[in-house]
Amino acid sequence: MSKEPTTADGLQNRFRTHYCGRLNRKSEGELVRIAGWVHRIRDHGGLIFIDLRDHTGICQLVVLPENESQFKLAETLHSESVISAEGKVVLRSDETVNPRLASGAIEVVVSSIQIESNADPLPFPVADDMPTSEELRLKYRFLDLRREKLHENIIFRSKLTAAVRKYLTDLDFIEIQTPILTSSSPEGARDFLVPSRLHPGKFYALPQAPQQFKQLLMVAGFPRYFQIAPCFRDEDARADRSPGEFYQIDIEMSFIEQDDLFVILEGMFKHLVENMSHKRITQFPFPRISYKDVMNRYGSDKPDLRIPLEIQDVTELFVNSGFKVFASNTAEGSCVKAMVLKGMGNESRLFYDKAEKRARELGSAGLAYIQFKEEGPKGPVVKFLSEAEMNALKERLGIVTGDVVFFGAGKWEKTCKIMGGMRNYFADLFPLDKDELSFCWIVDFPMFEYNEEDKKIDFSHNPFSMPQGEMEALESKFPLDILAYQYDIVCNGIELSSGAIRNHRPDIMYKAFEIAGYSKEEVDARFGHMIEAFKHGAPPHGGIAPGLDRLVMILRDEQNIREVIAFPMNQSAQDLMMAAPSEVTAQQLKELCIRIELPEEEK
């Protein structure tokens, strides 16, 4: 084939003129040059068929025996070898059309093959999605990334990131990169520390989030900031949390109120779901639920609203009850909660034993329940309740024959969480639609909480949030009654992000910290640079930072965060492919004035 001028799309060079997955019936008769990996190779009755794969898909090559030199060359190929091939596009016969491939109506009859790189035997097959240990997958991640599903996840992530950028820049957001080397903050998760060669004995830290920088950008007069921000936290892995590093869609705006931010975020998620996913949003605008309400109704501040169960408060029904377990938990600060499972009252004893076991795992002393059977109510607490209490329960909860009601009693927060855990436990009884995205905002978080261990008032979440009512609330309200402009966005039981309207006034900040037991000197020592900035004209501002990794997980139906990250660490925070973390040389340590002293058990 004659050499064509080089083009920006990577075609018309010596390797390819076309992409494998974009050849179709319209390509019939064309002379093409394609390149990629040998997905499969088969010898069928003297014909060699090669499935050639590039990032667009797969195309079938046919090597005829009369093309003797190329036939012999094809016989030497291994799976995952890299080749380029020239040939003519022909239509397949009707009986050999492969409808699963975009190029399934055609094949390329090969005139020549060039081996660019022959592959050694593989540690696991790429073409077949057979189960492979995670250790092997991570060690050979470059092979694992060739597998179709993982490959598509990474491409999807790229497209999603591009869509986020376009959505936000169209709304006049400015993308600004913040420092990766910054100062350490002992609050929150552990920092990753970076020793300074130029300043012996001192350390930088990788940012846990660009929080302070993005607020300083508001002070600097940038009205709308965003960044696809890398964040670093030295914390243990979970299925939805990668150890060490993760990415967030970091957003901050000045001169806004809480509702302004909600409108922009809801619009962004709606745009992403409608344009990049087959999933559907259950309710738009997203429902807003106060922290107190969400704990009372769902027992969690990250509820899965698809679960058709709701916790109900029945405390007042047992104020004068003869059943002391309930009656003793009717005073302020305690409660009696109930949850009805409709039509589940005739389950086996094993069902209730397993439920009680789960309740104990959640911290309960047991699990009280009543089955409403044809022959009358049954269960371990029936004998302790009066007929009037039973009737009041049935009326309050809408109970009919065939239902079962579960109870929890104790301190309000603990009881809510136990009942919320049981709600999640019973979720498996219901066919939840994985294509339904049930977003919600959790709002009106308490500003302060009582720290039982230290016997003092402490911040409940973000100490830099603006209290609702501002200075007046701090000066006139009981601390535990003060609410903050803090909010979480949740989808299907997964917290995507926390955010807040920030406290931009030093006087309010000093007062809030004073309530939590900090002196002005302590606040200045820890956060002096922020307060100094706020003293020079800080606008009202607020923000949020949805997790990019978790968002991709939800939209791609993945249960493990490592399935949406190109090069993740394992559960032990190790990169098996790059052998990190690793030892360094004595000279490197000497330059940094560092000496290693391992714990006794590791020596």
Curated annotation (Swiss-Prot):
Q: Which residues take part in binding L-aspartate?
A: E187, R233, H461, R502
- GO biological process: what's one of them? aspartyl-tRNA aminoacylation
Instruction: Name the enzyme group at the top EC level.
Output: ligase
Question: What are the start and end residues of every segment in region (Aspartate)?
Answer: 211-214
| EC number assigned by the record | 6.1.1.23
Query: CDD domains per the record?
Result: AspRS_core, EcAspRS_like_N
What does it catalyze? tRNA(Asx) + L-aspartate + ATP = L-aspartyl-tRNA(Asx) + AMP + diphosphate
Q: What is its main location?
A: cytoplasm
Sorted keywords for this record are: Aminoacyl-tRNA synthetase, ATP-binding, Cytoplasm, Ligase, Nucleotide-binding, Protein biosynthesis
Spell out the InterPro entries in the cross-references: Aa-tRNA-synt_II, aa-tRNA-synth_II, aa-tRNA-synth_II/BPL/LPL, Asp-tRNA-ligase_1, Asp-tRNA-ligase_1_N, Asp/Asn-tRNA-synth_IIb, AspRS_core, GAD-like_sf
Where is it found, in Gene Ontology cellular component terms?
Answer: cytoplasm
User: What residues does the record give for site: Important for tRNA non-discrimination?
Assistant: H44
Annotated residues that bind ATP are located at: R233, D234, E235, E495, G547, L548, D549, R550
- The organism sits in which domain of life? Bacteria
GO MF terms on file?
aspartate-tRNA ligase activity; aspartate-tRNA(Asn) ligase activity; ATP binding; nucleic acid binding
Where in the cell does this protein reside?
A: Cytoplasm
Q: How the protein assembles, per its UniProt entry?
A: Homodimer.
Would you identify the family this protein belongs to, as annotated?
Belongs to the class-II aminoacyl-tRNA synthetase family. Type 1 subfamily.
Q: What does this protein do?
A: Aspartyl-tRNA synthetase with relaxed tRNA specificity since it is able to aspartylate not only its cognate tRNA(Asp) but also tRNA(Asn). Reaction proceeds in two steps: L-aspartate is first activated by ATP to form Asp-AMP and then transferred to the acceptor end of tRNA(Asp/Asn).
Protein name in the entry: Aspartate--tRNA(Asp/Asn) ligase
